[in-house]
Every structure is written in structure tokens, then in C-alpha cells.
């Protein structure tokens, strides 16, 4: 092959992982990232793998599908997981990170690799012949997005994604807050703002009547269920939030709680949780409160939450449009393009949803781009693993109804034999089998 390097376009979670996986296999990489010369409305820095939504990489237990995926990625030497572990902050049973520290570490590990050349410029054309991984994310620049859209025959979809506000912890009234993780799982890592029934009803009424920021497009609003704006959720029904981000189950009042409550109930009617957002513990985000309300409305409504009456918002919630491909028709299970075989795609644009899933797609695409470069057979991870089931799902789903997908046990191949009724035991067996089946792939 005349090509002496592989291109990776985009240094987000997927692109950073892809570049790292290619370089560790001894192949030079040209990693293109436009931030630094051109930014996006949602990004705040030029660092790689910047987290623009939550700072949580979700559950860490093997009985959680994303926890299994993370363990598989650790064993495959993921630079994203390596950086996350080094910058983690307390979050109960979840893996949450110091947002800035995490991105800075990914940037350093990737930039300092001797085989990776970082080029800060916007790419507006798709390479015709060079092996290239395109991982420009849901915020792909307009010029390149048009080329990708044309390459794929105009087939593509979109949904709207949102981020939650971040608050200065020193402006929270801690007399109205208690520290606890749900069901006391892990360390007591969340600040909990309890509400009485009347407080919740007043909050719900203010939320559903608050003014939203206008969209920049006349297209129909479509949301990914896992990142739905809190005001959209509230409009679905008065109790919808009580089964979502304001669920009180497992968050009983502490014995010394002196605030208002409904009678002698040991559990609040509703709870708003806040999660540590940086290593210093000076910033907290409101868990599950992604929003597209106008900034003034966010301050007015969210300051109704007990303890947040005088809260200072260091970042208000924002919403952006995410585009993704018709992967079932356009991509092979290795994330290789069916239309232009020198191209691989990775990240949210492929229809995987979530930080960890995006990085996992970059890992798979990077490994297979390297194998194509070396003239080796493509590597398809087994469907009994999380990292094999996710690419299989997004490339084999029904194209007519295809929507972004988080990793979950429902897409991993079922166990042989009679179905185990106990969910925890069943998930443990699936995880055990997954790690066994992954073992032969670790040195490839």
C-alpha cells in the first residue's frame, strides 16, 4: 500500500480512541481537529474528548450493560477509559469524571504519542482513496456534513440533544440538602434536594409554563429518550418526572433532617439530585435536568428547587441538533462504509448513543482501519460481548425505524439454555460469558 498513514478526522471521544488504537498498532496517524481554529456553539475548549453534556460515564457494575462495555474497553486498552479512571470523581456506583481534567488527559496522551500528528484545521472534503476514520460527531461542521450527506445518498436522520445546568456549590443552601446515593450504593456522592408534594406541584406548574429558547430550524422536534429536556418530560404528565430524574425511591430522609416534609413520610415526594462535576468539588450539575429553556427562565424555575434559591449558574443548559447516519444501509459491522471502502465512521453519527458507546465505536473503527492498512482480515467482536453487540445492532436494525441506541443487555446475545429468571444472576452470567469470549481478541 502506498499510503503511509491513516487519517482520523475529529478528536472527540470516538476520534481520540480511534487514533490511539491505530497508533498503538504501529501505524502513523494524522489526526485532524478543527477546534482551536474554529469552534462550535456547544464546545468551550479546544481539548480532545470534551464532554458537552453530563460528566458521567454511567454505571460501573458488570450487572449494568454500560459497566460491562467499560470493562471490555479497559481490557482492550482504551485511552478514554484510562483517562476516565485517572480523573474520576465520587458518584456512587457510577463512573463520573472531572470534566476538564478528563479532556486534558486524553489530549495529552493522544498528542504525546510519537506516531500521532495533530493537525488543527477544518476538513471540508472527504478523502477519495486514503484510509480515513471520520469521527466528527453530532456537531460536524456544515461543509463536511454536506459531503457526508451526499456520499450517503442523502440518507440521514437527526434528533435534539440537551445538557443540564452546572452550579457553584458554594451558593447552595446546604441546610436544605442531604448527602446520599440511591439505596446507599457506593459512597454518599449526591446532593439531594427533597420536595414536598406542594413544592413539586408548584415546580411542575412553573416548568411546563416556562418559555423555551427557539430552535434554529423549522424541523420537527425529535429527542433521544436518554437525554430528553426536563420541560418536555414534564409536559408528558404530572408524574412523569417522579419516575425519572426526580424519583425519590431509595433516597430516604436522614434521621437528622429538619426541613419540611409531608407528615411522617420517611421518603420525600420528589428529589432533585446534584452530582459533582469537577475534582475540586466546587461545581455540581443537576442530574437529568437537560433543558432548552431560556436562560432567565432556567434561573427562575430551577431556583424553586429547595437549596437552590440563591444558586449561581456557571453554565446554563443548552440544546443542540445531533445528526446520525442510516447505518443499517450504509455501514458494515466494523463501521466501514459500504459505499466507499476506504472510509470508516465512528461516534454518535453512526447511531450509537452515549459517551462510552461513542468511544467504543472509535475503538472498533480504529482497530479495523489498522487491519485494513495492514491487509489483515476485519475483526468482528462476538455478539455475546457488549462491544460486539452494539456495532451489530446499529448496522442490522430496521432502517425504517432506526434510532440511536445505548448499549443494553437486550441487544447482547441471549444465554444458551433455559432463561434465568433472576435478573441480577442473568446479567452476571452474561457478563462472565462476555469477558470469556472477549479474551481471544485482546491481542489482535
Curated annotation (Swiss-Prot):
InterPro entries: FAD/NAD-bd_sf, MnmG-rel, MnmG-rel_CS, MnmG_N, TrmFO. Its cofactor is FAD. FAD binds at residues 10-15. Gene3D superfamilies: FAD/NAD(P)-binding domain. Pfam families: GIDA. GO terms for cellular component: cytosol. Keywords: Cytoplasm, FAD, Flavoprotein, Methyltransferase, NAD, NADP, Transferase, tRNA processing. GO terms for molecular function: flavin adenine dinucleotide binding; tRNA (uracil(54)-C5)-methyltransferase activity, 5,10-methylenetetrahydrofolate-dependent. Its main location: cytoplasm. It is an enzyme of class 2 (transferase). It comes from the Bacteria. Its EC number is 2.1.1.74. It is found in: Cytoplasm. GO terms for biological process: tRNA methylation; tRNA wobble uridine modification. HAMAP family: TrmFO. Catalyzes the folate-dependent formation of 5-methyl-uridine at position 54 (M-5-U54) in all tRNAs. Belongs to the MnmG family. TrmFO subfamily. This is Methylenetetrahydrofolate--tRNA-(uracil-5-)-methyltransferase TrmFO. It comes from Streptococcus gordonii (strain Challis / ATCC 35105 / BCRC 15272 / CH1 / DL1 / V288). The gene is trmFO.
Amino acid at each position: 500500500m502506498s499510503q503511509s498513514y491513516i487519517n482520523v478526522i475529529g478528536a472527540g471521544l470516538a476520534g481520540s480512541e480511534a487514533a490511539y488504537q491505530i497508533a498503538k498498532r504501529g501505524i502513523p496517524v494524522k489526526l485532524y481537529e478543527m477546534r482551536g481554529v474554529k469552534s462550535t456553539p456547544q464546545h468551550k475548549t479546544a481539548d480532545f474528548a470534551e464532554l458537552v453534556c453530563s460528566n458521567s460515564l454511567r454505571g460501573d457494575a458488570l450487572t449494568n450493560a454500560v459497566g460491562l462495555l467499560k470493562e471490555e474497553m479497559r481490557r482492550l486498552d482504551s485511552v478514554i477509559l484510562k483517562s476516565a479512571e485517572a480523573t474520576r470523581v465520587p458518584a456512587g456506583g457510577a463512573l463520573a469524571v472531572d470534566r476538564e481534567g478528563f479532556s486534558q488527559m486524553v489530549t495529552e496522551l493522544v498528542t504525546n504519542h510519537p506516531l500521532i500528528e495533530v493537525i488543527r484545521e477544518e476538513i471540508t472534503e472527504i478523502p477519495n482513496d486514503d484510509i480515513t476514520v471520520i469521527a466528527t460527531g453530532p456537531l460536524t461542521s456544515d461543509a463536511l456534513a454536506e459531503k457526508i450527506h451526499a456520499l450517503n445518498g442523502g440518507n440521514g436522520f437527526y434528533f435534539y440533544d440537551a445538557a443540564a445546568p452546572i452550579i457553584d456549590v458554594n451558593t447552595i443552601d446546604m441546610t436544605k440538602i442531604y448527602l446520599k446515593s440511591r439505596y446507599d450504593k457506593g459512597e454518599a456522592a449526591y446532593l439531594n434536594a427533597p420536595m414536598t408534594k406542594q413544592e413539586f406541584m408548584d415546580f411542575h406548574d412553573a416548568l411546563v409554563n416556562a418559555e423555551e429558547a427557539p430552535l434554529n430550524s423549522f424541523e420537527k422536534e425529535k429527542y433521544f429518550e436518554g437525554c430528553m429536556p426536563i420541560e418536555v418530560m414534564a409536559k408528558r404528565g404530572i408524574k412523569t418526572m417522579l419516575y425519572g430524574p426526580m424519583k425519590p425511591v431509595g433516597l430516604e430522609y436522614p434521621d437528622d433532617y429538619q426541613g419540611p416534609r409531608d407528615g411522617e413520610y420517611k421518603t420525600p415526594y420528589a428529589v432533585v439530585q446534584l452530582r459533582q462535576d469537577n475534582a475540586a468539588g466546587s461545581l455540581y450539575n443537576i442530574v437529568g435536568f437537560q433543558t432548552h429553556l431560556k436562560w432567565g427562565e432556567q434561573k427562575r424555575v430551577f431556583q424553586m428547587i429547595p437549596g437552590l434559591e440563591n444558586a449561581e449558574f456557571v453554565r446554563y443548559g443548552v440544546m443542540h441538533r445531533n445528526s446520525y447516519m442510516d447505518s443499517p444501509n450504509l455501514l458494515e459491522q466494523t463501521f466501514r462504509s459500504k459505499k466507499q471502502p476506504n472510509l470508516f465512521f465512528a461516534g454518535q453519527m453512526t447511531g450509537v448513543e452515549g459517551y462510552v458507546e461513542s468511544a467504543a465505536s472509535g475503538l472498533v473503527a480504529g482497530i479495523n482501519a489498522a487491519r485494513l492498512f495492514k491487509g489483515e482480515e476485519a475483526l468482528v467482536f462476538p455478539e455475546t460481548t457488549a462491544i460486539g453487540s452494539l456495532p451489530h445492532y446499529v448496522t442490522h436494525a430496521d432502517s425504517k425505524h432506526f434510532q440511536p441506541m445505548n448499549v443494553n443487555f437486550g441487544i447482547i446475545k441471549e444465554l444458551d439454555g433455559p432463561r434465568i429468571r433472576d435478573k441480577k444472576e442473568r446479567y452476571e452470567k452474561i457478563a462472565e460469558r462476555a469477558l470469556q469470549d472477549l479474551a481471544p481478541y485482546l491481542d489482535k
